[in-house]
């Protein structure tokens, strides 16, 4: 049952096709809803965002970015990853950040993902009714400067995933709760050698395996590492142009457990490990409408070799005084990603 729901989730994320849902490294992980990236701005730029993260979504992408915040900010997102295949699957995210002069900045976030209706059956396949499975994560983030151009950040997470409405789930000859709880941490680094160049890295979802049936069958968290660069080659009083790129490596390893961020680099052949890497690139052109208002055009590309995805992305953004609104679109004709729009809103004060 756990594997069926995991496959469904990864289909909804577009990380693999229906026939290959169990073939990706990420599909071995529990709490894979944590891989739903919340920002429409990031999505429009191919999800290359670890070296940007200049809004409350930094609590998800890179907590080190919080160090540069000087105002309170709020970000929210709600979207349906596969509206053509399962309209009851949705993901929502909200975050709030608060600056504290001289000691660093705090952030708080929540992610809730409905995995839709599931059918509960007994060992013989007889129907026992329907239920809605879901995943939820709560995070507290902190970011501060080590030096003028170097910042670090950390996020502590509480994670819960409920895959059954029964507290007595049977898988083969074994029984379990059908729900799991765990804790994890994210770690971020951001370096700005000059005002227009940023280099950043983030290690996310570092924590122990999550148990649903018993400890021997516990599944790893979706640990991953991202290295990114953002550069502004052009900027004047009215407009600017930003380019960014990320390299993403999934690291879940059932045998590695908590230390998957170490063992996840070498638990397969070098060729397979290399194919696990995703490449993301994005660009943003922003035009200032006034001192506090702007319009943005965005485009990107996401290359996921093992998931068989090569997806162009696009989007728009509008900033008006204290509020922002962003929309993104995956330019993909596959059943999983066709007509996937993502909307985000936020404000600062």
Role assignments for model-derived ranges:
Residues 1-32:
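Cleavable N-terminal export/targeting peptides
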Residues 20-349:
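Subset of outer-membrane beta-barrel
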């Amino acid at each position: 049952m756990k594997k069926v729901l995991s496959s469904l989730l990864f289909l909804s994320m577009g990380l693999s096709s229906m026939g290959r849902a169990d073939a990706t490294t990420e599909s071995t992980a529990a709490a894979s809803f944590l891989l739903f990236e919340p920002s429409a701005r990031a999505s429009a730029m191919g999800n290359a965002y670890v070296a940007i993260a200049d809004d409350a979504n930094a609590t998800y992408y890179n907590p080190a970015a919080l160090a540069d915040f000087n105002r309170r900010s709020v970000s929210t997102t709600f979207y349906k990853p596969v509206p053509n295949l399962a309209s009851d699957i949705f993901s929502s995210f909200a975050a709030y950040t608060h600056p504290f002069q001289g000691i660093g900045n705090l952030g708080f976030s929540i992610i809730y993902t409905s995995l839709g209706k599931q059918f509960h059956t007994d060992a013989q396949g007889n129907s026992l009714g329907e239920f809605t499975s879901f995943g939820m994560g709560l995070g507290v983030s902190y970011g501060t400067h080590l030096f003028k151009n170097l910042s670090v950040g950390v996020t502590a997470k509480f994670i819960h995933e409920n895959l059954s409405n029964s507290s007595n789930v049977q898988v083969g000859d074994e029984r379990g709760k059908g729900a799991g709880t765990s804790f994890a941490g994210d770690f971020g680094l951001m370096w700005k050698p000059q005002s227009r160049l940023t280099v950043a890295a983030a290690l996310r979802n570092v924590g122990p395996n999550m148990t649903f049936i018993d400890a021997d069958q516990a599944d790893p968290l979706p640990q991953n590492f991202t290295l990114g660069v953002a550069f502004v080659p052009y900027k004047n009083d009215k407009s600017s142009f930003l380019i960014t790129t990320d390299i993403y490596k999934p690291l879940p390893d059932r045998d590695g457990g908590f230390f998957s961020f170490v063992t996840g680099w070498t638990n397969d052949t070098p060729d397979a490990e290399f194919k696990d890497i995703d490449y993301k690139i994005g660009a943003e052109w922003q035009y200032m409408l006034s001192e506090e208002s702007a319009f943005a055009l965005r485009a990107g590309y996401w290359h996921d070799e093992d998931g068989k995805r090569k997806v162009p992305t696009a989007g728009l953004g509008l900033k008006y005084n204290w509020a922002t609104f962003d929309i993104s679109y995956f330019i993909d004709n596959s059943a999983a990603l066709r007509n996937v729009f993502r909307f985000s809103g936020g404000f600062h004060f």
